[in-house]
Amino acid sequence: MKKYDVQKFELLSNEQIADGIFDMRVKNDELAPLAKCGQFAHVYVPSKTLRRPISVCDSENGVLRLVYQVKGEGTKIMSEMKKGESVDILAPLGNGFKIEKGKRYCLIGGGIGVPPMLYTAKQCENPLVITGFRNKDLIILQDDFKKAG
């Protein structure tokens, strides 16, 4: 199999976690396990020409987690997708990050730049994670980071 491919993923959930921010979980036992921290996926949106690039937030047990912010028509359509739908995704894309054993990492991100840090934090040993958000209504994934260590 290639390093990446276009395949159908089953939409397990697509929930709003903050104002205009959604947490989409899609299942594909073949492609999801290939994702590395720092990679992204291209999500096909019906009636739109271009796919939407979304950072990989996490990948576990054949489930790819994509956290995205509604910014235009394409991501608005994505936010309306329902559990059980089939989602056309090209993944995993990008080189990802190389995490070296025995090193401590400091991960810094803000807003919608925070989601790809979660998968990275889970791969690191005792990472220092610093996040920032415009206001309290946009704070996301803090419990997930605590669980990651």
Segments (PLM) and residue ranges:
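Ferredoxin-reductase
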Residues: 2-83
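FNR/FR-type flavoprotein reductase catalytic core
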Residues: 73-149
